[in-house]
């Protein structure tokens, strides 16, 4: 699944990839980039049938029951096939259904337990005999059917269930998605089963290892479109203007990948692939699916070739769903998307949106093999799905669109997202033990998406991309239609490469965090490298520093990059192969760690960057490492400022993006400091970018490359945000023309920045104008940009209006609540207002976004992590100490870590930052 994290650090990303993972221009604080489980966050998980050693016999019925470490179903039966018929009833937002599940009986038993949530069972039969002993466990989300007679071992049992449920508005299970058409609210019925919401749609064995076949039928009004995972088998007319559409039986798949949709839909098709490709959307928007359909055709061909396995399903439908919590969902053969991540006017979209849509489509299609065809055994293997799909989307994009140079962006995007979150004490290993269903959504974060993909990139660099992809192909062929553990992938890569991948990667996947590698120059052409755990707060305890990672040092010298040297102990001495005093650790930034040099080496590397001795990835990594080391206290922030000041002539967009992000993180940390320091930092920012901004300007032409467009838009956004008079004046003038009817006055690449700037300086009239754009947009992209800008207003009475909209789901969709919150986080008044809103409306928020869904943790993080002071942190702790933290406890812990890190940073460096700005004459 693609995360709903919409940060546009580079436009090609991640939150993410349930984060991926969307639409933000810049998060001022780098720390928060990781915390929108992208959706950016994604969904996927529960638990699997345990090993025999983890079972015990219950004395009353002899059925194998899993120990309570993990909430999974008994293994006395195994589902083989579901024959499911379901009908949505839009008049009262309910649905009714019936199913017959074929089970293989593994042992003599007199009961079957299934997952069920908010489902009313009206009737049940086992092998045609009525079942009346039916009990529910709301806490475990199960229903148990107890029979008069035992089922015999080895037999096939048929359990018939007739049921009803709510066509809910929670964007989970079988739910209703609303949209406007001709001023009227209309609905479609759609599904989101991942991670554990198939149980909301029909009673099921809702665990990823319980793969079954499904024959699905939908009953609906004749004029509505019905879709499911497989192609249509037959349609039968029913009384009352109804029809029953039955679909072909699916191949083996997990319940979280089941999908069905009923609605008034139109489609555009692409015939450039061997199976039909269609993009569905609400009437009048279908033409906006052409770009994604073309991307899909190219991508499926590419993956067929790379994996050596043809796309495994009989069609590909991609559907834009108007109410959708994640970025996208990889249901077999029926992929669902947020509208903004599928539909695009390619001729009028900004470059970051185009890149985002491309990445999301590629990510979901990679899942059709990696996740759907071959599926994780249980949910602590989530990263297998998400990390690989993220890596594969970058790999495919680099192959199909080499001019985009996405691996350069990767270092500033996925890698930094991963390192940022994993530097928190409240992070988690790539492989996470999951006990309860309400814990699952919390691990749809940058660790699953970005650290997972970063680890795979590191392996691919070590083994070579061709060998890596060959190993993956072998893995898919060996395990197709089955389930796997992480070790299965490592073994396949070991066999393909001859390297001991299992030994190396077990350490990376099963331990929290990553190291900082300190480089000491000891003379005689030798350096000593030492690894310790890195924390954003800079206060690692001895007990937290036990893991020794296999660190691929990637020693770069004038002779190239030596990939053979690995640091597996605490320290190691290395003889440099050259005597010209040029070296850098982590060449091309392939490794997952930070590097700390002696002060003189930072200066020399800064000079090497200017002289062209460092690759784009090296330069990005150097800035990122300096920024992270400054915020955590390993170096002074003035050293970071010295480095970026020396690179004012930098020409690469990705490097500039990292520079501006790091300055943004300083600004966020200083948010509650004195105005003089903040004003001086703005003056420095304007001076830093002035020469390059004058060179590039912000006019766009048909001759501009992808990178040219990104650089112009990024520099303009930073100039306007730093109150550059010329940029601000242009933003105001362009907006006035736009409001007056000149729709060409705002270039798509500048739209978000211009909206934000006008909001920042705007009044009630400006708010009304942006609100009108939001309610009557010309594109989804324009709608999102207007919504995000709401948070940029600074007048208290307008901020009251903005926060007043957050819980009005008829105006701001539940899925979009975080978008104006991102804007509010950009300034001091907004951060304070956001906390006031969160604390005063908590009970209502908790009802709207219950902990079992993925968005509550994101809202908690957004509403709290903008703070920078210990007294503010204490206020947050005291508030949540009185609340039930279930379902968002990890997000809260991470947010508190973020506040601590910023508090320590400002206590340590605020004075020296001002002194540096003063010494460089930025305080006038």
Swiss-Prot record:
Keywords of the record: Acetylation, Aminopeptidase, Cell wall, Glycoprotein, Hydrolase, Metal-binding, Metalloprotease, Protease, Secreted, Signal, Zinc
E.C. designation(s): 3.4.11.-
Subcellular localization, as worded in the UniProt entry: Secreted, Cell wall
PROSITE patterns according to UniProt: ZINC_PROTEASE
Cofactor annotation comment: Binds 1 zinc ion per subunit.
Record: active site: 364
Activity modulation notes: Inactivated by metal-chelating agents phenanthroline and EDTA. Inhibited by bestatin, an aminopeptidase inhibitor. Not inhibited by pepstatin A and PMSF, inhibitors of aspartic and the serine proteases, respectively. Not inhibited by carboxypeptidase inhibitor.
This protein's record includes keyword Transport: no
A Pfam family: ERAP1_C
Propeptide regions on this chain: 46-57
Presence of keyword Glycoprotein: yes
Modified residues (N-acetylserine): 58
Residues binding substrate: 194, 327-331
pH influence on activity: Optimum pH is 7.2.
Any one GO cellular component localisation term in the record: NVT complex
Disulfide linkage: none
InterPro entries: Aminopeptidase_N-like_N (IPR045357), Aminopeptidase_N-like_N_sf (IPR042097), ERAP1-like_C_dom (IPR024571), M1_APN-typ (IPR034016), Peptidase_M1 (IPR001930), Peptidase_M1_aminopeptidases (IPR050344), Peptidase_M1_dom (IPR014782), Peptidase_M4/M1_CTD_sf (IPR027268)
Biological processes, Gene Ontology terms: cytoplasm to vacuole targeting by the NVT pathway; peptide catabolic process; proteolysis
Sites annotated Transition state stabilizer: 449
Database matches in Gene3D superfamilies: 1.25.50.20, 2.60.40.1910, Neutral Protease Domain 2, tricorn interacting facor f3 domain
Entry's family note: Belongs to the peptidase M1 family.
Name the UniProt record assigns to this protein: Aminopeptidase 2
Organism name: Candida albicans (strain SC5314 / ATCC MYA-2876) (Yeast)
Gene name in the database record: APE2
């Amino acid at each position: 699944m693609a995360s709903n994290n919409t940060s546009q650090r580079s436009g090609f990303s991640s939150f993410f990839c349930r984060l991926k993972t969307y639409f933000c221009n810049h998060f001022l604080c780098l720390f928060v980039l990781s915390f929108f489980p992208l959706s950016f966050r994604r969904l996927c998980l529960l638990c699997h049938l345990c090993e025999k050693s983890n079972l015990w016999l219950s004395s009353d019925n002899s059925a194998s029951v899993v120990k309570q470490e993990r909430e999974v179903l008994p293994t006395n039966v195994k589902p083989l096939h579901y024959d499911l018929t379901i009908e949505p009833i839009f008049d009262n937002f309910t649905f009714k259904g019936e199913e017959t599940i074929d089970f293989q009986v593994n042992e003599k038993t007199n009961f079957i337990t299934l997952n069920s949530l908010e489902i009313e069972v009206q009737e049940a039969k086992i092998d045609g005999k009525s079942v009346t002993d039916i009990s529910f466990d709301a806490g475990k989300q199960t229903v148990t059917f107890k029979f008069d007679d035992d089922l015999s071992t080895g037999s096939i049992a048929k359990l018939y269930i007739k049921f009803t449920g709510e066509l809910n508005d929670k964007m989970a299970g079988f739910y209703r998605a609303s949209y406007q058409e001709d001023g009227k609210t209309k609905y479609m019925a759609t599904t989101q089963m991942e991670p554990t919401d198939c149980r909301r749609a029909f009673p099921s064995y809702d665990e990823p290892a319980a793969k079954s076949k499904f024959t699905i039928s939908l009953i609906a009004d004749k004029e509505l479109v019905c879709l499911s995972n497989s192609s249509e088998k037959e349609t039968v007319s029913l009384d009352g203007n109804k029809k029953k559409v039955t679909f072909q039986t699916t191949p083996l798949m997990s319940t979280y990948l089941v999908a069905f949709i009923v609605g008034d839909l139109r489609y555009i098709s692409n015939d450039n692939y061997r199976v039909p490709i269609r993009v569905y959307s609400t009437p009048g928007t279908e033409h906006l699916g052409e770009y994604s359909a073309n991307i899909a055709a190219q991508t499926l061909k590419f993956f067929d070739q790379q994996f050596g396995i043809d796309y495994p399903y009989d069609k590909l439908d991609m559907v834009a769903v108007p109410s959708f919590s994640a970025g996208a969902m990889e249901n077999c053969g029926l992929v669902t998307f947020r509208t903004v991540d599928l539909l695009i006017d390619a001729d009028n979209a900004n470059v970051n949106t185009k890149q985002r849509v491309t990445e999301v489509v590629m990510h979901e299609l990679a899942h059709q093999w990696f996740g759907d065809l071959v599926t994780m055994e249980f949910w602590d293997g989530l990263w297998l799905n998400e990390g690989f799909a993220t890596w594969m989307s970058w790999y495919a994009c680099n192959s199909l669109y080499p001019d985009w140079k996405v691996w350069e962006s990767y270092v500033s995007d996925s890698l930094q997202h991963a390192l940022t979150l994993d530097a928190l004490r409240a992070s988690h290993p790539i492989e996470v033990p999951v006990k309860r269903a309400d814990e699952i959504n919390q691990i749809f974060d940058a660790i699953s998406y970005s650290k997972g993909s970063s680890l795979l990139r590191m392996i691919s660099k070590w083994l070579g991309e061709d060998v890596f992809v060959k190993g993956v192909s072998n893995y898919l062929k060996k395990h197709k239609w089955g389930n796997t553990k992480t070790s299965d992938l490592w073994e396949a890569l070991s066999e393909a490469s001859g390297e001991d991948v299992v030994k190396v990667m077990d350490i990376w996947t099963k331990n929290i965090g990553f190291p900082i590698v300190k480089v000491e120059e000891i003379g005689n052409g030798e350096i000593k490298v030492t690894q310790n755990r890195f924390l954003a707060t800079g206060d690692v305890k001895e007990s937290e520093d036990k893991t020794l990672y296999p660190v691929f040092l990637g020693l770069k010298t004038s002779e190239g990059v030596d990939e053979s040297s690995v640091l597996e102990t605490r320290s190691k001495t290395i003889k440099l192969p050259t005597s010209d005093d040029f070296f850098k650790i982590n060449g091309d930034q392939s490794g997952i760690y930070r590097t700390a040099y002696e002060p003189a080496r930072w200066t020399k590397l800064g000079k090497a960057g200017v002289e062209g001795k460092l690759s784009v990835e090296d330069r990005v990594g150097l800035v990122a490492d300096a920024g992270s080391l400054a915020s955590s206290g390993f170096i002074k922030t003035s050293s970071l400022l010295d480095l970026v000041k020396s690179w004012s002539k930098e020409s690469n967009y990705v490097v500039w993006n990292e520079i501006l992000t790091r300055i943004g993180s300083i600004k966020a940390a200083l948010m509650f400091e004195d105005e003089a320091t903040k004003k001086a930092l703005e003056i420095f920012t304007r001076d830093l970018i002035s020469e390059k901004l004058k060179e590039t300007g912000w006019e766009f032409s048909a001759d501009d490359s992808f990178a040219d467009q990104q650089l112009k838009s990024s520099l303009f956004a930073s100039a306007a945000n730093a109150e550059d008079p010329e940029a601000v004046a242009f933003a105001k003038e362009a907006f006035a023309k736009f409001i007056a009817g000149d729709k060409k006055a705002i270039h798509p690449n500048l739209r978000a920045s211009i909206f934000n700037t006008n909001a920042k300086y705007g009044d009630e009239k400006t708010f009304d104008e942006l609100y009108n754009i939001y309610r009557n947009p010309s594109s989804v992209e324009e709608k999102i940009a207007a919504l995000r800008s709401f948070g940029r207003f600074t007048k208290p009475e307008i901020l009251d209006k903005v926060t007043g909209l957050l819980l009005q789901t008829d105006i701001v969709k539940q899925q979009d609540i975080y978008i104006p919150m991102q804007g509010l986080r950009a300034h001091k008044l907004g951060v304070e207002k956001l906390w006031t809103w969160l604390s005063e409306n908590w009970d209502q928020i908790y009802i709207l976004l219950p902990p079992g869904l993925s968005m509550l943790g994101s809202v908690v993080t957004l509403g709290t992590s903008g703070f920078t002071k210990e007294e503010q942190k204490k206020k947050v702790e005291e508030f949540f100490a009185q609340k039930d933290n279930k379902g968002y406890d990890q997000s809260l812990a991470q947010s508190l870590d973020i506040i601590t890190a910023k508090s320590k940073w400002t206590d340590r460096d605020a004075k020296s930052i001002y002194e540096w700005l003063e010494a460089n004459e930025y305080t006038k």
